[in-house]
């Protein structure tokens, strides 16, 4: 009986002595999963004429024109400059959160053959892509455009 007790005691002491698992690691940097391209969605005014372009879609509306583009992410200054023709430092760019994205918005004026134009830009940045919305219309219709653009710009998102 004494032998059985000692054997039982030794077995119970040794049962937790299993070999530790060996983990293997692979060399190289750990890369984050790539962010997939999303679709840009916007509420388009009724009666707008759509024109497909190389880098997005352009709509001619009754009082203004608007365009949606998806550009490579990265330098916001380059994107703002490409959309507005102005240096980002010469504009007041408002920043806010839009879900998991960052929302950048600004306005500017420009001269054209038709006269002074009011312009508005918006960029949604997901870290990999810039989802861009721009609108342009006659500056003398500023109040009317602002009302219409508020609805359109608030509807803009990427899914």
Language model features by range: what are they?
Residues 42, 66-68, 101-103, 117, ...:
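Short, isolated positions in well-ordered beta-strands
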Residues 47-50, 71-77, 123-126:
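A short, sequence-level motif marking secondary-structure junctions
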Residues 38-52, 81-86, 109-115:
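Short, solvent-exposed secondary-structure boundary motifs
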Residues 59-82:
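A short acidic-to-branched-hydrophobic micro-motif
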Residues 72-73, 135-137:
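Short beta-strand-to-loop capping motifs
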Residues 84-128, 136:
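Signature of long, low-cysteine stretches enriched in small and polar/charged residues
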Residues 77-78, 129-133:
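Short, well-ordered strand-loop elements centered on a beta-strand within folded domains, enriched
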Residues 2-64, 127-129, 136-159:
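N-terminal targeting sequences that direct proteins away from the cytosol to non-cytosolic compartments
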